[in-house]
Amino acid sequence: MNNGNREYKSDVFSMLMEDKVNALSVYNVLNGTNYTNPNDLEICTLDKGVSLTIRNDAAFVVDASLSIYEHQSTVCPNMPVRNLVYYTTIISKFIKNKNIYGRSLVKIPVPKFVVFYNGDEDQPEEYYMKLSDAFEKKTDKPELELVCKVYNINFGKNKQLLDKCTVIKHYMIFVDYVRLYHKEQELEDLERAINYNVPYKVDTTRERDCLKC
C-alpha cells in the first residue's frame, strides 16, 4: 500500500518557492519591499544544476541579498549549521571566477536566513537561532555568527504575516486540510488524505506525483 509522501509539506513548499513570482512575493512581505519583476530574482542552484529547493530549501538573490529559506515540520536546532553549509556552498560559486587573493575587495550578497515552521509541537510565533549556540565552548564575542529567524506559520500564529502573504497562507490552508482529513476523517492512508476532495488540494500532475512518491 502506498502511504503517500510523508515529506509532502516540505515538497509542496519547495515547489512553491521554485516559482519566481511566489518567491518574490514572500520576499516582499518579509522585507517590506515592493519588487514587481520576477526577473529581478535569481534562483541559486548547487553544482550540476541541482536546485537547492530539491533539498527542501529555497535560495535566491534579490537586490544583492541572498535569501535562504527552509521549511521545517519538526523543531531542528541545527538550522544555523545547515544554513552555514548552504551559504558557503553558494558563495563559493559567486567567487569562483574572482580573485579573492588580490587587493580589491570582492563583494558578496547580504545573507538572510529564514525558517518556516509548521509542526505539531507548540512554538513561539517568532524566534531566533544562532550558530554560536552550537559552539562547544561558549564565548561572549563569537568571531563567526549566523542568525536564523524562525516564523511559526501554523494558523493561530503570525496572523499578520499570513494575511499579508497569500502564498504562505494558501500553503497552510492546504496543509491544514490534509491534517483534517488524515486525522478527523480517520484516513490512515496519507495518500488518501492528500488526494481527498478538499477545496485547496494541489491539482497539477507534477505536484501530485511529488505528493505520492
Region locations from a protein language model:
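Elongated, amphipathic alpha-helical interaction scaffolds
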Residues: 1-213
